[in-house]
Swiss-Prot record:
Belongs to the AIM21 family. It is found in: Cytoplasm, Cytoskeleton, Actin patch. The gene is AIM21. Residues 109-119, 501-512 have a biased composition (Basic residues). The lineage of its organism: Eukaryota, Fungi, Dikarya, Ascomycota, Saccharomycotina. Keywords: Cytoplasm, Cytoskeleton, Phosphoprotein. Interacts with ribosomes. Interacts with ABP1. Residues 383-396 are annotated as: Interaction with SH3 domain of ABP1. Involved in mitochondrial migration along actin filaments. Pfam families: Aim21. Residues 86-95, 133-149, 164-178, 296-323, 414-427, 437-452, 483-492, 603-613 have a biased composition (Polar residues). This is Altered inheritance of mitochondria protein 21. Transmembrane segments: none annotated. Its main location: cytoplasm.
Length: 679
C-alpha cells in the first residue's frame, strides 16, 4: 500500500493533573511528582487532524458530577496468582492440631470448671492475653508490610469503599500467609483464653449465651486490607460510620472465619454433651437465629474489631492506644449459633480443588482395582446347571390327526398293490425252480424291498400307477381326446353361464312395475345367422361445365339423348320406339355433316357412337348396384372396350387440334364460339 493511504494515529492526549485532597510534606510531594505523569502545558491542547480509530473509554468530569475526583492508580505489574491448595492443606493441618489440643484441655478442666466462680483475675488475664496477641499481630504486620507511596495514601483517604476491590488476590494470599505464620504464636494465647472462658461459664450460668466463646473467638479481622494500606502515621478520622465497619466485615477472608467457626462449634457441642444441665439455656439460641449478614453486623457493634484494625494498621502508636482502650477491649460473644448450612457452603467454596483431587484419586484407584480383578480368573462358586430337556410337542388336533391317518392308509394301499404285482411275477418264475419254502422267503424279501422303495420319495420320482397329466395327454389316442372334448363341452353347456346375484337394493320392498316387467333375454349359442348389407355406395356427380369441357360434341349429344330418354315415361317408349330412333337419326346426320372430311374417313370415330347407343339402352333398362356392376365388369369385356374406344377418340381429337384440321382460321374461331355458346 502507498504511504498516502495509511492513516496516521494521533498521539493520546495527556490527562489533567488531579487535585490533592490533603497537603503533603516536601519529600512526599517530590516522590509523587516523580511518579506522576508530566503536567500538561498551560495553553490549549493541540486538536488532532484526524479522528482516532477507537475512542478512549474514560469517565469525564461532567458524567461523574465531580470535577475534582481522585482516580485509583493502576498497578504497573500484574499480581502473581498463587496456588491455594498448599495453603489450604497447611491451614487444615494447623487447625486439626489446635483442635486436638483444645479437646485435651477441655477434658482435663471440665470437672473443675463447674465448681469455680468468676474472678476478676481471670478477666484481667483474658484482657492481657488479647492485648498481647494484638501487639504480636501488629509487629508481624510491620515486618511483612512494605512502605506504600504517598499517592496510595491519598487514594485511601479519598475512597475507602473501593479499597477491598482493588487487589483481592494479594489480600487473600497475605491473609493466608499470616494465618500460617502466626498459628504457633496463637497456641499459647488460646489456652489462656479457654481457661478464662471456662471460669466465666462456671461463675455465672445465666450468661451462657454471652460468654460461651473465649476472648479471641470472634469474627475475624481483615488484616490484609491494613497490609495493603501500609503503616499510616495518623489514625483515620473519627467520622467513620457503622456502614464502613459493615463493609469491612463483609470483605474479610473466609478461611479464618471457617477455622474459628469450626472451633466454636466443636467446643459448644462438647460442652453441651458433657454438661446436660445447660441444655435448657441453649433453647433460646434457636429462637434468635437470623441471617448471615445480620449475624456478622450485630455481633460486634463498636467492640474490639475497630480497635484491632486500627492497631494492626498503626504500629508506631500501639502502646498509646492500648492504654486508652483497655476498657473497651472486652471480647463479645455472639448470641446466635451459626448455621450448619452456612458452614457447609463456606467449606465447599474454600476447598474445591482438594475435593476434586480426592475424587480423581479415588476414581483412579477404583479403575486400577477393577482392571486387576478383570485379569484374574474367577472360579465359579456354584456349578452350572444343566440345560432342561426339550419340550414335548403338543398333540395335533383331531382334523390334523385324521388327515395324517388318511395319508398313511393311502400310502400303504399303494405300496401293497405295487408289492403284490411284483410279487406275483416273481413267484411265477421262482415256482418252477425252487420249492414252496424258497418261494415264501423270496416273497417276503420282495415285499420288504417294495415297501422300502415306496417309503423314501426322492425328487423326480413318480408312482408307476399314476402318470403326470402332461404325459397322459401325449400318450392318449385322438379318439380319447375327442371324447374328453365332448365331455368338457357338455359340462360347459349344462353349467350356468354365471352366478346370478341378488340386487343390492332395499329389502322388503317391491320393485317398480317398469323394472319388474322386464324379461330376461336368453341367447342360443348353437344357432348362427348371417346377414349381408351394403356398408357404402359410390355416387359421382360432375358439374355440367366440366363435362362439356372434357367431352366432345358427339358425347354431349349422347348425354342429352340419355336425359331425354329418362324423362320420357316407359309406356311412351314401348308405343313409339321407332319415333325415337327417327328422331335420333336426323340429329346424328346433322353432326356428321358438320364434321370435316378427315373425320369421315376414320372408322374408329363411328364405333363409339354405335356402341354407346347399344350400351345406353342396356344400362337404362336396369339400374345395377355397385357390387353387381363390379361383378358384371369382371365377367364381360364391354367396359374395357368402351374405355379403349374413348381413349382412341381423345387421341384423334388432340391430333386434329394440333395439326390444324380446320381449313381457315375463321372456321376454327366459329367452332370455338359455338362450343362456348353451348356451354
Amino acid at each position: 500500500m502507498p504511504s498516502e493511504v495509511t492513516p496516521k494515529v494521533p498521539e493520546r492526549p495527556s490527562r489533567r493533573k488531579t487535585s490533592e485532597l490533603f497537603p503533603l510534606s516536601g519529600s512526599e510531594s517530590g516522590d509523587i511528582k516523580a511518579n506522576s505523569e508530566p503536567p500538561t502545558p498551560a495553553g490549549t491542547p493541540n486538536v488532532p487532524t484526524r479522528r482516532p480509530i477507537l475512542k478512549a473509554k474514560t469517565m469525564t468530569s461532567f458524567e461523574s458530577g465531580m470535577d475534582q475526583e481522585s482516580l485509583p492508580k493502576v498497578p504497573l505489574q500484574r499480581p502473581v496468582r498463587r496456588s491455594t491448595t498448599e495453603e489450604l492443606n497447611n491451614v487444615m493441618n494447623n487447625t486439626s492440631k489446635e483442635l486436638e489440643e483444645i479437646e485435651s484441655l477441655i477434658s482435663k478442666h471440665n470437672i473443675h470448671s463447674v465448681s469455680r466462680k468468676k474472678s476478676p483475675t481471670s478477666v484481667q488475664e483474658g484482657k492481657a492475653a488479647a492485648i498481647h496477641q494484638n501487639g504480636q499481630r501488629s509487629a508481624s504486620d510491620n515486618k511483612t508490610s512494605t512502605n506504600p507511596s504517598p499517592l496510595e495514601k491519598n487514594e485511601h483517604k479519598g475512597d475507602e469503599g473501593n479499597e477491598s476491590a482493588i487487589s483481592p488476590s494479594n489480600s487473600v494470599n497475605k491473609s493466608n500467609n499470616e494465618v500460617t505464620e502466626h498459628s504457633d504464636s496463637e497456641d499459647l494465647t488460646e489456652k489462656q483464653k479457654v481457661h478464662a472462658a471456662l471460669d466465666n461459664e462456671a461463675g455465672d450460668g445465666s450468661h451462657f449465651e454471652e460468654k460461651l466463646i473465649p476472648g479471641d473467638m470472634k469474627v475475624p479481622v481483615d488484616v490484609s486490607k491494613d497490609v495493603e494500606e501500609g503503616s499510616l502515621n495518623a489514625l483515620p478520622p473519627s467520622g467513620i460510620t457503622e456502614s464502613d465497619d459493615k463493609a469491612e466485615k463483609f470483605t474479610k477472608h473466609p478461611e479464618s472465619s471457617l477455622e474459628e467457626l469450626q472451633k466454636h462449634q466443636e467446643q459448644q457441642e462438647e460442652k453441651i454433651f458433657q454438661n446436660p444441665t445447660d441444655e435448657e439455656s441453649t433453647t433460646s439460641l434457636n429462637e434468635k437465629q437470623e441471617g448471615k449478614d445480620n449475624m456478622e453486623v450485630n455481633s460486634q457493634p463498636q467492640g474490639p474489631s475497630d480497635t484491632e484494625t486500627v492497631i494492626a494498621a498503626t504500629s508506631s502508636n500501639v502502646p498509646s492506644q492500648i492504654a486508652s482502650e483497655e476498657e473497651n477491649d472486652v471480647p463479645v460473644i455472639p448470641r446466635s449459633r451459626p448455621k450448619k448450612d452456612f458452614e457447609a457452603h463456606v467449606q465447599k467454596e474454600e476447598l474445591p480443588n482438594t475435593q476434586e483431587k480426592l475424587v480423581s484419586e479415588e476414581c483412579d484407584s477404583t479403575l486400577i482395582s477393577t482392571e486387576e480383578e478383570s485379569k484374574i480368573p474367577k472360579i465359579p462358586s456354584e456349578r452350572p446347571k444343566r440345560r432342561a430337556p426339550p419340550p414335548v410337542p403338543k398333540k395335533p388336533s383331531s382334523r390334523i390327526a385324521a388327515f395324517q391317518e388318511m395319508l398313511q392308509k393311502q400310502q400303504q394301499q399303494d405300496l401293497h398293490n405295487n408289492g403284490n404285482s411284483s410279487a406275483t411275477t416273481a413267484s411265477a418264475d421262482i415256482a418252477k425252480k425252487h420249492t414252496d419254502s424258497s418261494i415264501t422267503s423270496d416273497t417276503t424279501k420282495a415285499d420288504f424291498t417294495s415297501k422300502l422303495n415306496g417309503l423314501f420319495a426322492l425328487p423326480g420320482m413318480v408312482n408307476p400307477g399314476q402318470l403326470p397329466p402332461s404325459l397322459e395327454k401325449k400318450l392318449s389316442s385322438p379318439d380319447t381326446e375327442s371324447k374328453l372334448g365332448t365331455q368338457d363341452q357338455s359340462q360347459a353347456k349344462t353349467g350356468p353361464l354365471g352366478g346370478t346375484r341378488r340386487g343390492r337394493g332395499p329389502r322388503g320392498r317391491k320393485l317398480p312395475s317398469k323394472v319388474a316387467s322386464v324379461e330376461k333375454i336368453e341367447e342360443d349359442d348353437n344357432t348362427n345367422k348371417i346377414e349381408i348389407f351394403n356398408n357404402w355406395n359410390v355416387s359421382s356427380s360432375f358439374s355440367k361445365e366440366k363435362i362439356l369441357m372434357d367431352t366432345t360434341p358427339g358425347e354431349q349429344a349422347e348425354r342429352a339423348l340419355d336425359e331425354k330418354s329418362k324423362s320420357i315415361p316407359e309406356e311412351q317408349r314401348e308405343q313409339s320406339p321407332n319415333k325415337m330412333e327417327a328422331a335420333l337419326c336426323p340429329f346424328e346426320l346433322d353432326e356428321q355433316e358438320k364434321l370435316p372430311a378427315n373425320a369421315e374417313s376414320d372408322p374408329l370415330s363411328q364405333l363409339p357412337q354405335t356402341n354407346a347407343v347399344g350400351n345406353r339402352k342396356a344400362i337404362s333398362e336396369e339400374s345395377l348396384s355397385p357390387s353387381e356392376a363390379i361383378a358384371n365388369r369382371d365377367q364381360n369385356d364391354t367396359t374395357e372396350i368402351q374405355e379403349q374406344q374413348m381413349e382412341d377418340q381423345m387421341e384423334v381429337d388432340m391430333e386434329r387440334e394440333l395439326s390444324g384440321g380446320y381449313e381457315d382460321v375463321d372456321s376454327a374461331l366459329h367452332s370455338e364460339e359455338a362450343s362456348f355458346h353451348s356451354l
